[in-house]
Amino acid sequence: MVNDNKTYFQRSLRIERIPIDFKYKIWNLLLIAKAKLNTTHDGELNTTNFDELNQMIDSRINNPSYSEEIKESLNFIKDIKNQCNLLPSVNFLTPNKNYDDLIEKFKVILLNLRFKEDDIKNFNYNGQHYLNDQHIKLNRKGIEYYKNKDYGNALKCYNQIEKSPFKSLSFHLISKNSLNLAILYSKLNNGPKAIESSLKSCIYNPLNNRAYFYYGRYILESNKQKALDHLYTAFIMESKTKEKQYYEHEYFSLKDTTISGFKKVEESLKMETRQNLLNMYHFIGPSNNQISQTVEQYMDQVANQTQTEKAHNYNDWVTKINDKIKLTKQTIKMTKRKFLSIDELISNPFDINEIQFDALQSNGMNGIVKSGTIGSMKVVVKFPNSYFNGIISTATINSTGSSEWSFGSSDNGGNNSNSNGNSDSNSNNDSNNNNNNNNNNNNNNNNNNNNNNNNNNNNNNNNNNNNNNNNNNNNNNNNNNNSNNNNNSDGSSGDDNRNSDNLIKSDLIDECFLNETVSHLLINEFQINNTPSIVGIGINMIVMEKVDGTELEKYDKTKLTKKIFMDLVIYLMEMNIFEIQHRDLHAANILIKEDGSLSIIDYGYSNIGDDRKGYDISNLKSIYYDFFNNYDTINHDKKEKIKNVFNYLNLNLNSNSNLNLNLNLYSNSNPNSNPNSNPNPKSNLNLNSNSNSNPNPNLNSYSNSHSNSNSNLNSNQKILIDLLNILIEDEEILIPIHSKSYNDERQIEYIFAKRDNDKFLLNDKTFPKIPHCLEMDNKIDLSETPMLKTNIIKKSLKTILPPFIKVCDLEIKGKKELVFWVQDRGNIIIYVPISIESQKFNGCVCPYGQYFHSKLCIFTDKEEYDIPLSFRTKGNIHLDDKPIARFRPLTHVRYICFALKLCDGLKNEYIIEPFEEQFEK
């Protein structure tokens, strides 16, 4: 049973193509190393071997200008290259902890591996895009050769695709490519190879009716009965009218039987089709599961039965399987927010209507989970560790009746998708069979009946089929001739007497890399990946991860330490570095795992880049992203001051009024490393500043250089102005998937209820306020804070002229402290009370992440500022009586970093007494 003390979460994040298995990770990292080492890059990469990488490394090792550390790193890369099998295959084993450690070490080495900028300045590598280009070129060549009946050269092209190291990333494409090879082998009269390739196509896509058809044709001479079984399977699985008629004709023209073809169709429909059981068997796999064993027994028994016997015994076996399911319901109850491990699946069979298969949880790994719906079964399969640790999903797929797919919610998406996923999946479930005789009316894509009504619909269809049997039989001969003419493009091999020139589009992958949209590959991945050790890849795929942990708000407060707080800040900084904005960050979405590590979940309103809908895969880009968790320089000793985090955030103020923010991602030891050595151009942000600051490189020396207490407050405000000016840069940010596009005027209307005499009044329905009280000294509890239940006192209440809003100056009662808390409504607040001699400067950061806007609250002794961060501008912010320039929301993590840096620079240390007193007992 699932441990009730652990919390299991699933949330959605729509992403683009990503790498997912450990061999591909190493392959990717080696490409990065190769890119850094390559000084003669010509736009082409050899994707089949890395022999030239050894030569590059050897030339660098012999170069006296490189340090011993770099040479040692190069030898490490060379060892990895020589020891690892770099080409991903479908039979690789699940990576163990040793491989994970190796990959993490590899990342650290690459981050510290520096060469001259000239070595890589012209290198613009996009692995997936390059892969697509290569496959497209090979596919085009293969088609041209096929048109010219040059089958030998066409075979060479598709064999190159077959040998590609990326070939295991899409089983849909493997199945298609194998089918092409089978056709070409048959053209070259190589029967064994044709059989082998067509069988491989069947294996990689169990629902590929055409693969079954070709395989049946190829083995007809050697094994007639098996060939007929495969031809019949292709006939049953086909949903298109013309192809179905053709497959039916092929099958019954070869089978010696007195039963008419359409009578056979009627019997197959009465079975509800055994394909439902086949699908379930494929997804369950050969485990010790009771249901799986029952299905296997059924499959063994029906192997040598006639179709009539199969239909007769089907209901008995369905009853047996349902009885097993009823028994399992008493031992385990599945919910949409819980997973099971492999061991738990074996010991506790599951509900057939909610199959959730966590393929790797027994290894204690986090990774990708793919979910799909086949018939009445919702299938969730987890695959190896991905770069997107901490990002999870429950979105299901709903067919819209076209080639596009919509992403439903976790609450009702599964129910909506149970019947809709049938027409494209060829799964031959109840609703799909209803449509077999109705495709001319286009009913196959409008199957909105619930599963509870499928049996009734099947009975109705059976009656219709009975009534139409005679007519269908009378027209059978006519249809046979027509189907031959209409389906010339679907024939394939050997002694086929149809015109081979008309076979091109259906037989070969006609520009499939250009024409296949996201939906085609996505649904096939859900259907095909039935073996946990076989890992596929999708485009704009749904990503999930199982996270074992406890919500921050429910975590034992006595166990909260400074390390947890620091890890959270670092985690948020990493999100900022990779430009990911959470937009719904609160205590329930921050999990603390058993080992004390943090994981932030619920990225349901985040998005990376554009909202791509049905883009050709040649237009999609790769995203290589990971949280770099190796922070060797941070010592989490509780006595140490929390300031090492700024090894990764260097803030330099100089006399030239240029503010340089260097996110030092490529070195974890030297906070003052040369920013020019950073290969990431986005890591250096240079913007104008109005600061008249001291040229010293850090805020600490800057603040110490001011002795006049009367100017301290103004100086601190100027520093904050400089920091805010960094945020007014013209860059892309993440937007909610379902957010509407608002112009400035519409945004104003959304945030503010109305405009009265140049005053903006808040729209209470869309913009929550900070809690406040009119009575002086009345304590206010700012919600259930995860780290501190802080009582605050409202010192004053001032009305700020537009575009400011009513806010109150808040002061934490008690000692000087740095307080971090998260409000229930998704607001992050960092409150930094800082004493500088006799003056106070209270800084508060409060972005409202779940809306289209944010706001930055700045509280001082004399003035209060509430700056809407909902609009876009290229100007500077001025904290005076003039209206503050509005700008669009940026990642809230930056505000956190700036507030922390401000605190560090002005006070020379973090003030963390409450954490030590309350949490480190």
Swiss-Prot record:
Residues 334-628 are annotated as: Kinase-like. InterPro entries: ABC1_dom (IPR004147), Kinase-like_dom_sf (IPR011009), Replication_Regulatory_Kinase (IPR051590), TPR-like_helical_dom_sf (IPR011990). Residues 401-499, 664-711 are annotated as: Disordered. Residues 401-494 have a biased composition (Low complexity). It comes from the Eukaryota. Pfam families: ABC1. PANTHER family: ACTIVATOR OF S-PHASE KINASE-RELATED, DBF4-TYPE DOMAIN-CONTAINING PROTEIN. The kinase-like region is slightly similar to the kinase domain but does not correspond to a canonical kinase domain and is predicted to be catalytically inactive. This is Putative uncharacterized protein DDB_G0278921.
